[in-house]
Amino acid sequence: MGIKEDNWIRKMAIEEGMIEPFADSQVKLHPETGEKLISYGLSSYGYDLRISREFKVFTNVYNSLVDPKCFTEDALISIVDDVCIIPPNSFALARSVEYFRIPRNVLTVCIGKSTYARCGLIVNVTPFEPEWEGYVTIEISNTTPLPAKVYANEGIAQVLFFEGDATCDVSYAERQGKYQKQQGITIPFV
């Protein structure tokens, strides 16, 4: 299983719609204002995805219990903004700007960007399995005792694409994975 390079990622994004919208290079400055950004777009061996303006932040207003088998949105407040302030030692869900369509012979691994990691924000994204498609639900943990700011429409994590030595027998789409074609921030369900 080998990691795929920028030329392959570009070709698959342009010809097969693997990533939409697709930034063909690392974007480090806002195209209109020139303001510095947390980079996103194509890199040497991956693609830095962006976080959208949609966030769901954990709150304890209703004294909810977090149960992955019976999750309730009472534990979350929805935010649509250019920034999201994650409270100390708290957690947020978000979604990617980009929509992904993963080929049958590819598996991805997603790693949080070092800019956020060095601020105590840990980004978790589960692998994109063969033939999975949708917007990515992104999990962000603020491990610090301070509030932390996350910027919408800027880079949040890097996606690495690995091509299998052989094609899998059953893809995510064929086994009717529960998060197939997710559109917004998708909460857990069993």
Curated annotation (Swiss-Prot):
Entries under CDD domains matching the protein? trimeric_dUTPase
List, alphabetically, the Gene3D superfamilies matched.
Answer: 2.70.40.10
What keywords appear on the UniProt entry? Answer: Hydrolase, Nucleotide metabolism, Nucleotide-binding
Record GO terms (molecular function): dCTP deaminase activity; nucleotide binding
Identify the SUPFAM superfamilies for this entry. dUTPase-like (SSF51283)
Q: Where are the transmembrane segments?
A: none
> Which Pfam families does the entry link to?
DCD (PF22769)
Q: Tell me the route in metabolism or biology where this protein functions.
A: Pyrimidine metabolism; dUMP biosynthesis; dUMP from dCTP (dUTP route): step 1/2
Q: Which residues form the signal peptide?
A: none
Please state which protein family the record places this protein in: Belongs to the dCTP deaminase family.
Q: Which NCBIfam families match?
A: dCTP_deam (TIGR02274)
**UniProt protein name:** dCTP deaminase
